[in-house]
Structure formats: C-alpha cells, structure tokens
Amino acid sequence: ELLDVMALYKMNKFHWHLTDDQGWRIEIEKYPRLTQIGAYRDSTQIGGWNSPLYDVNIHGGYYTREDIREIVDFAAERHIEIVPEIEMPGHTSAAIAAYPELGSLKTPPTVATYFNPTWGVFNVADERVIQFIQDVFDEIFDLFPSRYIHIGGDEVHPESWEANSDISRFMKEKNLDNYSEVQMLFTNRVASLIH
C-alpha cells in the first residue's frame, strides 16, 4: 500500500531502514544467525520513549530474499527506486547479538527491546567486521538495483570504543586523535566497498 501511495504522489525514492538495534530485517544467506537471532527480541517497549511499559511477547520477523525481490520489482513497476539502509557502526545490537565477535564490548548486547540508541557498536578495528560488511553488501547489491545504499552512521556511543584495547591500538597505528576520526576512517573504508 505504501508503494502505491508513493506512486500516486509521484514519489520515486523509498529509503528502506532494514537494520537497527531492535532487529535485523533482511535475510543474508552467508550469515543465517542474523535472522535466526537478530530478527527477534523477547519483548518490546510500548507507550513511547522512556516508557516503563513492555509487551512481553516475542516480536520480530524479516524479509526473505524472495520477499525483497518481489518488493523491488513491485516498486520498479511504479517507477520507485528502493534505497536499502544497513546501519553501522552503531545501531548494530541485533547483528552483534547474532555474531558477538563483531562487537566492541566484551559482553555482547542482546537484541534491544527499547527504542533508544544502545551500546551495540561494531569493533571497527577488527578486519572481521570489514569482511562481514563486504559479504552483506555483496548480497544487498544482488538484491537491490539501486545506485545507492545508506550506511547509517548516527548515534555511535564512543564509550563502546573507549573500553576496547583493539580500538586504542588502531587509533595509535592510524595516528587518530579522537573517536570522530575513528568513525570517519571507518566510514571512508566502508564507502570504498560500495561498487
């Protein structure tokens, strides 16, 4: 229905936010735990920001590769380009819950149940994170014909990096003075993976 309404109003770009702390919503064949673990949370906050109320039922779900292809085709028939978003280096609790080795903290987060930014941040000094991103991008590029991909980049908690000796070593090796520079270097590296 949303795509039909967009077409009615001649809107031709749909930015699809597919990942966040609260859930990973797209099937990636190389990383099945993203949807086995990362797509579900054991409860969810209700009643708005900072509400103490929770629905204690399991929440979640994800789009299969077939679902994605069908939606991309449906949008294209309406002259709508879908721009996928895969959040990084923050807003990655769902991915890290599924693959803890990607995270910056010693204790990996769970899939977030509340709607504020969490401490789930990629360990950007670890080459496994870059390989993970490349692998995910390879599958995203196969599914989406868009010339664009959105990589998020907001609300990264530097505290997640402060406690990580890999990040300290990385900063020294790269002659970086602060965490903004760490994020900038990471973002530039990720941008170079987009082909």
Language model segments and positions:
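A conserved hydrophobic secondary-structure block that centers on an alpha-helix together
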Residues: E1-D21
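Generic structural signal for well-ordered alpha-helices
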Residues: L3, I68-V72, I86, I133-F141, ...
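Conserved, mostly hydrophobic/aromatic
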Residues: M6, I82, I133, I151-G152, ...
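Short, well-ordered coil/turn segments that N-cap beta-strands
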Residues: K10-N12, A76-I80, P145-I149
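Hydrophobic faces of well-ordered beta-strands that scaffold small-molecule active sites
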Residues: F14-W16, I82-I86, I149-I151
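Aromatic- and acidic-residue-enriched carbohydrate-binding clefts of CAZyme catalytic domains
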Residues: Q22-E77, T92-Q131, E159-S180, M184
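Short, internal active-site loops enriched in acidic
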Residues: M88-G90, D154-E159
